[in-house]
């Protein structure tokens, strides 16, 4: 049986995977990046480093690789005159993009397990009394749940395009859902929180009347209602907040090791290991015995028995708390 080292967040091996990725990653950055605040959550920290400003992708890459490797990486939806100012008023807001967030786990009942990483027993509380350590939680994200999120995203895109004449961009969040972003300029960028709330409520179907007897092919809400679409399930606060942080496209999500990825065609999206940039194999040491769906495949793990699995799967399982990546095997 393998030796448990109480994986507290991330190991140096996981950090090396992330650093090697960012050495060559082509991050999708806004053309006006000098007007954006950048932020990150470093490895081994529960707090964010904020109020960062960069003028080029090279400057950003140097900072990430050599000074502050990110577990999570963001830039602001807002444009500021002084994005590095620590006081929000001093930043001087100039407008914001329009954001929508769809979390697939809000659409499904997912299997959740809380356990002790030392003894492997299921535990209800946040601490194992037997071993005096904090417990870990694993939530199984299924392909079926992601499909539900994708369907909600498809409905949202239709509303934004057909009812508002907007050109939304869709991104897989890197973990459990989708981000939809509209690059805003002029009056769109200057929408305040109340106006954005009205847009959020519209796409959620709040206050939209029923249209019994209408055609499924009718435009707008008449057709949607008669197709059984009563609204889109979004995180309303994300849309309302004019100073929201956005995950940088092509960055890595620290809870999965998957890429925050542009989805140009929703019909082509698949929740599988191609969303991971990592190749080769890892030796993975499971904390518990479990059979679970991982990126579209069923994986069987036995507590304390090392297993050789693809790096994409091993890193995902590590970041999802199911065990530790012990070694990299080419």
UniProtKB/Swiss-Prot annotation:
InterPro entries (UniProt xref): DNA_primase_S, DNA_primase_ssu_euk/arc, DNA_primase_ssu_PriS
Entry superkingdom: Archaea
Top-level EC class: transferase
Keyword tRNA processing belongs to the record: no
EC number: 2.7.7.-
Binding-site residues for Zn(2+), renumbered to this chain: 116, 119, 128, 131
Active site (catalytic residues): 101, 103, 235
Note: The bound zinc ion is not a cofactor. It is bound to a zinc knuckle motif that may be involved in sequence recognition and the binding of ssDNA.
UniProt family annotation: Belongs to the eukaryotic-type primase small subunit family.
Protein name, as recorded: DNA primase small subunit PriS
Organism: Saccharolobus solfataricus (strain ATCC 35092 / DSM 1617 / JCM 11322 / P2) (Sulfolobus solfataricus)
Taxonomic path: Archaea, Thermoproteota, Thermoprotei, Sulfolobales, Sulfolobaceae
Gene designation: priS
């Amino acid at each position: 049986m393998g030796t448990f080292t109480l994986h507290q967040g991330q190991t140096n091996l996981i950090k090396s995977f992330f650093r090697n990725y960012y050495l060559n990653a082509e991050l999708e950055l806004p053309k006006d990046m000098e007007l954006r605040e950048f932020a990150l959550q470093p490895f081994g920290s529960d707090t964010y480093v904020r109020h960062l400003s960069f003028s080029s992708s090279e400057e950003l890459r140097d900072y990430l690789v050599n000074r502050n490797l990110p577990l999570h990486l963001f830039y602001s939806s807002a444009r500021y005159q002084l994005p590095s100012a620590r006081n929000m008023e001093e930043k001087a807001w100039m407008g914001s993009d329009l954001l929508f967030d769809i979390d697939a786990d809000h659409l499904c009942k997912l299997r959740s397990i809380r356990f002790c990483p030392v003894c492997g027993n299921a535990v209800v509380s946040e601490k194992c009394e037997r071993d005096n350590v904090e417990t870990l939680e694993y939530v199984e994200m299924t392909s079926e749940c992601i499909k539900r999120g994708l369907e909600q995203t498809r409905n949202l895109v239709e509303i934004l395009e057909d009812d508002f004449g907007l050109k939304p961009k869709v991104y897989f969040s890197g973990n459990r859902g989708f981000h939809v972003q509209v690059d805003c300029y002029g009056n769109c960028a200057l929408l305040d929180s109340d106006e954005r709330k009205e847009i959020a409520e519209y796409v959620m179907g709040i206050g939209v009347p029923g249209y019994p007897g209408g055609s499924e092919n009718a435009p707008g809400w008449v057709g949607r209602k008669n197709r059984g679409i009563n609204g889109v399930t979004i995180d309303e606060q994300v849309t309302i907040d004019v100073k929201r942080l956005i995950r940088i496209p092509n960055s890595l999500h620290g809870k999965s090791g998957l890429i925050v990825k542009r989805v140009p065609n929703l019909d082509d999206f698949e929740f599988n290991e191609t969303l991971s940039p990592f190749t080769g194999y890892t030796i993975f040491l499971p904390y518990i015995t479990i059979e679970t769906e991982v990126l579209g495949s069923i994986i069987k793990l036995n507590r304390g028995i090392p297993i050789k699995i693809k790096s994409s799967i091993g890193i995902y399982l590590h970041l999802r708390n199911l065990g530790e990546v012990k070694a990299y095997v080419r």
